[in-house]
Amino acid sequence: MAVQAYRSLKKYETFSYLPQMTPEQVRRQIAHAIAQGWNPAVEHTEKGTPAKASYWYMWKLPLFGEQSVDAVVAEIEACHREFPDQMVRFVAYDNYAQSQGMAFVVYR
């Protein structure tokens, strides 16, 4: 697996150091989050702002109890269609730890 140059692009999350995920890899990550019992959500923000200083806007409400990967991917695609010039990320909330279990940018 190829790794991108360290300082070539802005880093928004852990997977930023790897090449862009394929749609199948995104689906597998979402399936893993659902299998953990985490609640999926979709967020978006403007491009060009530093990741730590930017505010991520929630797309609708979290998909509480959603078990379908297709439904989550459909929401990600709908958000991207609505905001084609913005970054879109997937977030999985862990009810037990009361924190994010996973988050990664799907569209940079």
Swiss-Prot record:
Read off the CDD domains from this record. Answer: RuBisCO_small
The keyword Cytoplasm is annotated on this UniProt entry: no
Q: Which UniProt keywords apply?
A: Calvin cycle, Carbon dioxide fixation
Which SUPFAM superfamilies does the entry link to?
RuBisCO, small subunit
Query: What molecular function terms (GO) are annotated for this protein?
Result: ribulose-bisphosphate carboxylase activity
Which example biological process does GO assign this protein?
reductive pentose-phosphate cycle
The domain of life is: Bacteria
Describe the subunit structure.
Heterohexadecamer of 8 large and 8 small subunits.
- Output this protein's name: Ribulose bisphosphate carboxylase small subunit
Organism of provenance: Nitrobacter vulgaris
Tell me the gene name: cbbS
